[in-house]
Amino acid sequence: MPEQGASWAVFMEDPLSLEQCAGRLERRGFRSFVVPGLKEAAEVMLGLVREFSPSSASYGDSMTLKAAGILDDLRSNPDIQFYDGFVPGMEREEKWEIRRRGMTADLFLTGVNAVSMEGTLHWVDMVGNRVAPVAFGPRHVILLAGSNKLVATPAEARERIRRIAPLNARRHEGFRTPCMHTGILSLIHI
């Protein structure tokens, strides 16, 4: 886990399940927030950014983070060096270099493929630029998950990833993975 622990902003519909999941995440060392929607999740995340006062920030690609608008807030903050390795049209080598720098930023934000009711987080990461910073690097990590990410068990998390990861991979130019064509992630040890 990152030095200061991770913060978790989550929004979903079923408050009972959410509170249970949040409690299990907290037992694993996460600060957890249950909020009713994306707007409120963005407000919590902005509050955490103010609390952390990072001099640098980066992110792992996440449609939910983009929808929340938090990335635009970080980009426009003159006090934060924002490492954005996802700029369209940027040369591949430059993207890699910026993503490497982002892994040691003061703040890293990302989504997650699935969260089990047991309080476990599940990812499949094509290049590792989301998982690596969550495990080590930034002083602070904020994870954001929508209701679509909550599953009952780790086995259900793996099944969700098998179905969803190929759809997500299709969004990225220049990547050619087998699952993009078959529609099913087929890793042996997932």
Give the location of each predicted region.
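Phosphate/pyrophosphate-binding loop motifs in nucleotide- or prenyl diphosphate-using proteins
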Residues: 176-184
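Flexible, glycine/proline-enriched loop segments at strand-loop-helix junctions
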Residues: 8-9, 31, 86-88, 141-148
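N-terminal active-site beta-alpha-beta segment that forms phosphate/nucleotide-binding
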Residues: 14-99, 104-109
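Alpha-helix boundary/capping detector
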Residues: 51, 75, 145, 183-184
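Iron-sulfur (Fe-S) cluster-binding modules
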Residues: 1-28, 52, 170-177
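Long, charge-patterned amphipathic alpha-helical coiled-coil/hairpin "stalk" segments used as oligomerization
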Residues: 95-176
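Short, functional N-terminal and low-complexity linear motifs
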Residues: 7-13, 38, 123-126
